[in-house]
Amino acid sequence: MNERSPPRRPATFRLDDPGVVVTEADETARLGRGTIQITPEHDPATLPVPIEAVLPARRGLPWGALFWSGLAGLTLLGVGLGVVHLIEDLFARSESLGFVGLAFAFVTALALAVVIGREAYGLARLATIEKLHQRAAAVLASDDRKESRVIVQDLLKIAHQNPQLARARATLESHTGEIIDGADMIRLAERELMSPLDAEARRLVSSAAQKVSIVTAVSPRAAIDVMFVFVAALRLIRQLAYLYGGRPGALGMIRLLRHVIAHLAITGGMAASDSLVQQMLGHGIAAKLSQRLGEGVLNGLLTARLGLAAIEVTRPLPFAALPPPKLSDLATDLLRKKEDEEE
């Protein structure tokens, strides 16, 4: 019978001893004779904690949407009944007045249908550009060659209405049949199509920031400043949307404004603007500018930051091959202009 070997007695050893081998718990190593194997225990605090999947929240009835839909339906019914009664009263008074009222009602209905159609087209166009941006970002990560060709074709359709991009479209179309990786194709499309648009967008943002800084520096009332900044911001967002292929109407502008504000909230744009203003105005520039000009510079920088966020939102391709415009460059131009005006 085989006798059991006695258990190993406690002993001391050095970790740098070549006869001591430290292995993980799941490793199986073939050790030589006289070699000591040490398997360290894992600290429970450092072990990964399994995260349970969050169950999707149960969505109830959209009472807010139902309320506004019902209110809009009742309003349309009331307006329709009022128009019908008005036309009936006009016919009762005079047949000619009835036909005139009927013609006005027809023109109003036709104009309303055109406005609704334009709003729907603008919303659909904005949704197309937004999805194109997301698809391009996915191709940059996955390098999908087939999907990149589809994105380039969709991008060429959007850019077809811009005569300034005729040469860029021809150059890009000549490369669509070549063997190019998906991510490289997206970068090529960005360099060819977005480069002139980015330069024009930077000019629009710089011009809007300078106008805001000048008007707010000379305006006598704070209410005028707020109103002008708001109008200038809306106009800038609309110009950038048209530049990059969007056609927003009233509802489209509301949607764009929400996206721009959300982008600023995510990226901390206002905080970045404040820190930049404090940094640049704290290096002796504040002493050179008067109080009103300093307020104008601040409003101009905030407008510029809003414009940069609008570029990110309205641009159909993410920044990959081209560097995004920086607030520091626009701030340098704005401050230099203000110094010249002060002198």
Curated annotation (Swiss-Prot):
Main localization category: membrane
Membrane topology category: Multi-pass membrane protein
InterPro entries: DUF697, UPF0283
UniProt KW Transmembrane helix keyword: yes
Pfam families, A to Z: DUF697
UniProt entry keywords in alphabetical sequence: Cell inner membrane, Cell membrane, Membrane, Transmembrane, Transmembrane helix
GO cellular component, one term: plasma membrane
Compartment(s): Cell inner membrane
Domain of life according to the entry: Bacteria
Transmembrane segments: 64-84, 97-117, 214-234
Coiled-coil ranges from the UniProt annotation: none
NCBIfam families listed in its UniProt record: hyp_HI0043 (TIGR01620)
Family from the record: Belongs to the UPF0283 family.
Protein's name in the database: UPF0283 membrane protein blr7254
